[in-house]
Structures are given as structure tokens and as C-alpha cells.
């Protein structure tokens, strides 16, 4: 029996020095090492391979992905929702008008508070247009 592409990709991941990626925020690609970026693309390849072979990519039985999108977005919003679904998470969009942000709470404070309930938080804020 031949080894599946996913198994080979998992073995490749074990060879990379990516220990500081677990439970760590991902803000900018320029903060990542070459091996960390390689790991990200390797995981994407493994997920694609699983999906193409009609294998489950869900690593969560249930859970919550919260999106805080401060700027209008189509591709990023749908990409985040698709990724959450692929992993088994339900997406909840944070509506700033219905949150404490409308009353002066910072996005950082809000994200910190909801992080206790979420498995992942996606934030889209064009603070640095054209960077990252």
C-alpha cells in the first residue's frame, strides 16, 4: 500500500522548526520565518488533498469562529467562513453597532473578551493598507 499524499505532508511538517506557531497569533506574514510559511502552505496542501479524496477535514466537532471585519470585504469574509466550515466551526460575525465597540470599547478589548468563547478569531482591519 502506498503512502497517501497527506501522510507525506504530515511527515514533512514534523521536520520543520515551527514550535512557536501553536497557540500564537498570526498578524503579519513578514513576522513568519520561511519554515513557518512553508508549514502554512503544507497544511493547506494536506487539507486540499483530504478534501479531494472526500475525507473529512473537520478537526472540531463543534466550535465558534468569530469574524471582526472592520472594513467591507467579500473575498476575505467568505474565505474566513469557508475555512471555519472546512474545520467544523460555526461563524459568528461581530456587528460593531450592536457591541460595546459602539460605546467606546476598543476592538482589542472586544477581541480579548470574545476570545474566551471562540476557537478562532478573524480580524480584518485596513490599518496598514497595502502591507502584509
Question: Residue locations for each model-derived region?
Answer:
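Generic N-terminal leader/processing signal
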Residues: 1-3, 122
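Positively charged, low-complexity intrinsically disordered leader regions
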Residues: 3-78, 82
